[in-house]
Amino acid sequence: MEKTPRDFIFDNLLSMSAYWACTGAIIASLTAYYGFSLALSNVVTGLSGTLPILQLAGGLAYERTTRPLRFLRLCNGTWRVLLPLVFFSVLLPRTAGAPLMVVCYVLAIGIYQFACPSQTDWLVSSVGGRVRGDYYSVREMFFMLTYTGVFCAVSLIIDRAARHGAQQTGFLAVGVLETMLLAASLTVLLRLPAPERPEKEEPAPAAAALLEP
């Protein structure tokens, strides 16, 4: 397998495993730690299901940008920095840590969803026609294996910490694990080539004449 398709697999394994392992039940545990009400906890934990609406805006923004590689690196780099801060927020007093956690989580999820269309276009334009037919199925298979391992590790850390009355330590450990995964993913991200964009066709002379006032 060529270097670029392989790097896209590694980037997906590292970043998506870190992202999906820290949604749902793990975030619910963190909201319980901060003493959120049930209504607020449901809103926060449900963001991964409600914020995909931002993909519409993200696709339009990516289509209009003149610097696609910069757009991709900025969006993908930002949410990968913000996500571990969600768990490191427990280092602050709860009155300050709770709002910081919510802000970082909303921004991380929102920016990830905003960048999804551009990320898909980047992958397809970079590896299309250069990989075997089973590339995408192999990519998903390895992702599921990695995600399962990361999710189990995170769940065990949180459960063990809760049983020993050391929830803060547990969330810090999850933050360290997230930082390691996402830092590794950033090194891979910076190696990925610029997306290939087809040149926009100029309108035919006859068509251009029709458009003139």
Language model features by range: what are they?
Residues 1-62, 69-79, 84-87, 143:
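Helix-loop boundary and gating motifs at the non-cytosolic
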Residues 108-141:
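Cytoplasmic helix-loop-helix junction between adjacent transmembrane helices
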Residues 27-33, 60, 64, 87-93, ...:
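Transmembrane alpha-helix termini and helix-breaking/packing motifs in multi-pass membrane transporters
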Residues 13, 82-83, 89, 95-115:
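Hydrophobic core of transmembrane alpha-helices in multi-pass small-molecule transporters
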Residues 31-35, 66, 123-131:
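Short helix-loop-helix connector
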Residues 49-55, 136-158:
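Glycine-rich segments within core transmembrane alpha-helices of 12-TM secondary carriers
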Residues 171, 181-203:
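Helix-loop junctions on the cytosolic side of multi-pass membrane transporters
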Residues 1-5, 193-213:
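Juxtamembrane intracellular "pre-TM" segments in multi-pass secondary transporters
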